[in-house]
Structures are given as C-alpha cells and as structure tokens.
C-alpha cells in the first residue's frame, strides 16, 4: 500500500518534486526524533553508572526523563514522553504509556520531567566521567 502511494504521488506531483519533498520531511522527522531520544537520556544529574554498579530500577526511573510537552506534540510522539514507565517495562504499548504512568505515579515521583525550554541545556551532556560515573557538560 505504501509503495502504491509513492507511485501515485510520483505520477501526480512528479518524481523529482515528490522525492525532494519526501526526503526533506523524512530528514527533519528523523532529526527531531533523534533529538527527543537524546534529551530523554542525557540531562543534568541523570542516573548513569558503570556496568558493575548499574541498578535496573534506578536506571529506569532516574536515567530517563519524561517530557512535559503540549498534548498535540505528545500525540505526534506517540506518548513516548512518558518515558520512565517505558524503561520499567518496555512491553507496554505506546497507547497505554500515559495510563500506566498515571497508575504508577507513586513509583515515579523521583523521575525527571523536562519542558521544551530545558531541551537545549541537555545537548551539553555528552562526556562520560568514568571516575565519578556521570555525564558532564562540555561547557
């Protein structure tokens, strides 16, 4: 069905225009989702430990952020903004993440919530300090 849609769009809009437009949309979508993934794991005071000191529950709750974003944006991200509960049990389908998060909020009180305004600060945390077992900012 998807390939038939591409063929139809190529005939309707022209091959070069369709592929140019499609490539731009695909690239911007991928870049946005990579940024969201990065922000949900790299932020100030995120839980990060060496393998021998890793704790599964702390890693799930303290090592991933939840996003405090508008509902319309959350719809585009398929509720992955409720990320800590996803790390506790990755088998929860996206359409149940919000309900599971709310039902287990008492377990997630220490989890980090980030706003859109916090995103730019997260991109500084890319260096691993092995001695102190934490991410440190580049500036």
Regions found by a protein language model. Name each.
Residues 63, 69, 90-91, 129-130, ...:
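Generic structural "secondary-structure junction" signal
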Residues 1-24, 95-139:
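Non-catalytic, topology-defining segments of multipass membrane proteins
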């Amino acid at each position: 069905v998807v390939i038939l849609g591409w063929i139809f769009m190529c005939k309707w809009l022209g091959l070069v225009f369709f592929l140019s437009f499609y490539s731009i949309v695909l690239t911007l979508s991928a870049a946005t989702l990579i940024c969201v993934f990065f922000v949900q794991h790299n932020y100030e005071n995120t839980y990060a430990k060496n393998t021998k000191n890793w704790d599964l529950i702390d890693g799930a709750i303290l090592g991933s952020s939840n996003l405090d974003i508008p509902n319309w944006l959350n719809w585009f991200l398929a509720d992955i903004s409720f990320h800590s509960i996803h790390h506790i049990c990755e088998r929860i389908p996206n359409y149940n993440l919000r309900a599971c998060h709310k039902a287990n909020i008492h377990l997630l009180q220490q989890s980090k919530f980030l706003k859109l305004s916090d995103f730019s600060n997260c991109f500084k945390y890319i260096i691993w300090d092995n001695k102190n077992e934490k991410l440190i900012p580049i500036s």
